[in-house]
């Protein structure tokens, strides 16, 4: 348990015997009391810092009331710095370059003291503590305005300075405070973060997170002909993916220096173009803590949080996704290069953002890195007993609708739009953002409205995951202000159940593929406000959905208690991998059925990375902690499936792009769709057919799904005058006959639709 130093303890900074005792790793740090209480004039502090291995005595001498000179008695001194400091500016929060120097500003409502810690080490090594840190104690009578602490330091380098804060305050845990001056804290507004250098290196699991800055590099060159794709929402096809997992596997053929990095991602953009998607939804790329599980009392050393839902900071790109070592300045530049390359390829960038919790866990497994130690009572939701509320399922819940936290989130979003040119955001567990500071649901959450109405964010796609771990399920009811789209969880469940052959699902399936009007039309929203998906990072992959009835999460080390138990999956007759040709053929059909259903549905489709070749996690439906082939894209598997599985997936996506009847702006009217069904009330009917009418060129589309385990003879309607039907897709056929872009003529008045298969016809 962490405890704060007693507020009654005293020390004499002018005593020759004074030697500060810091329990932080920075054993060589020393403190410079800023003598600003009697004068608002600037002060000078002469600081002799050196790389020490021993404990030398510090001798402090008072020269004037507003000036301190710190001389260090040591056998060797390697560097001398002269700093000039002033009270600083209250805004903006974080670090900024001002006329006088470098300004630092930090919010803390309940802190009683704040100390700025600086390291001028140019080594960039993880053992910065050996290089010593300079500590500047802020005087609240000079360096504080309202609840913001601030100081300006002159003569600092314009980059490669590491910094953090020590914050002290009331020590009463029962009052909701978690102050501990012994911990060096990361600035919540740090735009760049220096963590450990190597992704997943357990030897660095206790490495410090520092803020840093770069005011020296030239602005990134976006290019004179650069432009945003600006793809209409109705035209999006989203590809959910993990930056590291995309190229980390050796099968990617990457140089190890760029495998799993932003630059490695760029090398594989042609694959995304071949597939046909036009938007990537990146699993978290904010600086996150992948080693959180390895610090617990019974650590799971094999677990590395590769999904990234363990946010350390909301402004900085993940430094360990940079090429080579985890350099934050390089990470920022290479992230921009990735965005620029994606935009040049006509692909938008949507970030999966985690504003519902942070990496600081709970009071059982506390790991204070920033918010908790700066002002726990402001940044986190607390119950009436001042204990952490846990609507995120991760131990803490960010206090999103507190004015200060709300502004932090808005500033973060604006930063990613203006600095990194991203096109949109998917908000993880967004129902948390709809809760008041006491955790109660809000019908008109200030944060949700502010995001929707913000002028900087006006062109962005904003997508909610409309549920949380506290039971606030808002699918179809998420506050939207005509802006917010939603992950349509009901689409996932209903489509899974129909395709696998559950009874009584035909009506629900019809509602989902036609745009979920029951969820969105009633609230004056558009079909594209529903993001349709069958598979996402949570849960089974598409291949596992048709290969496993039960989750197999033993490798996670949680005794099978993690991951969802109700997956609406069907193993097609055998649990797991099999060599049975009949079962393998059935599984292939089912995967194609799911993909075809997704791409012909009204709304915005989203698919998961790897499903285009049939990636398996061997039944693990919660693989967040595996930095292995379990999550990594398998490029050799893609090569093996390029001419069949991948080809079908790609062709269906491109077919969607070229047919406006599959992506209506508004909900379908009677003249735009015909249902070929006369027994809607038959709960045992598992066959659905309909025609989408093209009122412009007469290129109607007929689609039929058969979820029975027997053939169904479908009666094919008459084509438009002067047209005939062409078979474009039949998931029962082998490649390349399963999808023929130009179509195959000769479709009769009836069509025998095979068990667990689907067809698509087009009139020409």
UniProtKB/Swiss-Prot annotation:
Transit peptide positions? 1-70
Entries under Pfam families matching the protein: Alpha-amylase, CBM_48, ISOA1-3_C
Instruction: Please name the top-level EC class of this enzyme.
Output: hydrolase
Q: Note the InterPro entries from the entry.
A: GlgX_Isoamylase_N_E_set, Glyco_hydro_13_cat_dom, Glyco_hydro_13_N, Glyco_hydro_b, Glycoside_hydrolase_SF, Ig-like_fold, Ig_E-set, ISOA1-3-like_C
Q: Which UniProt keywords apply?
A: Carbohydrate metabolism, Chloroplast, Glycosidase, Hydrolase, Plastid, Transit peptide
One GO cellular component term of this record is: chloroplast
User: Out of the domains of life, which is the source?
Assistant: Eukaryota
Q: List the subcellular locations.
A: Plastid, Chloroplast
Single Gene Ontology MF annotation:
isoamylase activity
Q: What is this protein called?
A: Isoamylase 3, chloroplastic
An example GO biological process term is:
starch catabolic process
The EC number(s) given in the record are 3.2.1.68
Its UniProt pathway annotation is:
Glycan degradation; starch degradation
| Site residues by UniProt (Transition state stabilizer) | 538
Active site at 428 (nucleophile), 465 (proton donor)
Family designation = Belongs to the glycosyl hydrolase 13 family.
Effect of loss of the gene = Strong increase of the starch level in leaves at the end of both day and night periods, but no modification in water-soluble polysaccharides content. No alteration of the amylase-to-amylopectin ratio.
Note, other? Double mutant shows that ISA3 and PU1 have redundant function for starch degradation.
Q: Which SMART domains match?
A: Aamy
Q: Which reaction does it catalyse?
A: Hydrolysis of (1->6)-alpha-D-glucosidic branch linkages in glycogen, amylopectin and their beta-limit dextrins
Primary location class: plastid
The task this protein performs is described as: Involved in starch catabolism. ISA3 removes different branches than ISA1-ISA2, namely short chains that prevent amylopectin crystallization. May be the debranching enzyme required to assist beta-amylases for starch degradation in leaves at night.
